[in-house]
A protein has these predicted regions:
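Alpha-to-beta junction loops
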Residues: 59-61, 77-94
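Contiguous mixed-secondary-structure segments that line small-molecule binding/active-site clefts
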Residues: 8-10, 51, 92-141
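Extracytoplasmic "Venus flytrap"
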Residues: 30-47, 68-72
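Short, low-complexity disordered leader/linker segments with a strong preference
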Residues: 1-28
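Short helix-initiation/N-cap motifs at beta->coil->alpha
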Residues: 65-79
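Short, polar/charged alpha-helical segment
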Residues: 39-64, 125, 129
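Structural recognition of the beta-strand scaffold that forms the well-ordered cores
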Residues: 30-31, 63, 88-92, 141
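Short loop->beta-strand "edge-of-pocket" segments that line small-molecule binding or catalytic clefts
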Residues: 29-30, 35-36, 135-141
Length: 141
């Protein structure tokens, strides 16, 4: 999860059987983004995540990235993932404040934490647990 964006993933349920990587089917998730992928730091992060996920999975897991508005409006990404219309999405946590009022507390805000402070808080002081608790009722992980 970055300072200005988050990858929203919908749980697909518990694993029933264990299979080897060569037997695993290819997974391709439609992933709309809130920011154009041409924008440094705002939109290009999801391309890096997509590349790394594909590399780590041996090409078995692919994020099919869609530019803003191609699948759903930017403000509707979280709701679309929650409803099961999309498998994943990349958005800014602050866009969810109408549905999840506490999200501004965990998103980038003016005069807030510096990036290194935010990262320390998120990973070492309970920020990640707070974000997970806020999004869990929406089936977003």
């Amino acid at each position: 999860m970055g300072l200005v964006g988050a990858l929203s993933l919908r749980s697909t349920g518990p694993l029933q059987n264990t299979i080897t990587a060569s037997e695993a089917p290819q997974i391709k998730w439609r992933t709309p983004v809130a920011f154009g992928t041409h924008l440094p730091a705002l939109g290009d992060n999801i391309l890096y995540v997509s590349e790394q996920l594909s590399r780590a999975s041996g090409g078995r897991v692919l994020l099919d990235v869609y530019e803003p508005g191609m699948l759903v409006p930017a403000f509707s990404i979280t709701e679309s993932v929650k409803a099961g219309k999309l498998e994943a999405g990349y958005t800014w946590l602050g866009y969810d404040q109408g549905r999840i009022p506490a999200t501004p507390l965990i998103s980038a805000v003016p005069f807030g934490l510096e990036p290194w402070e935010y990262t320390a808080w998120y990973y070492e002081a309970g920020g990640k647990a707070l974000a997970e608790a806020l999004y869990a009722p929406h089936n977003i992980h």
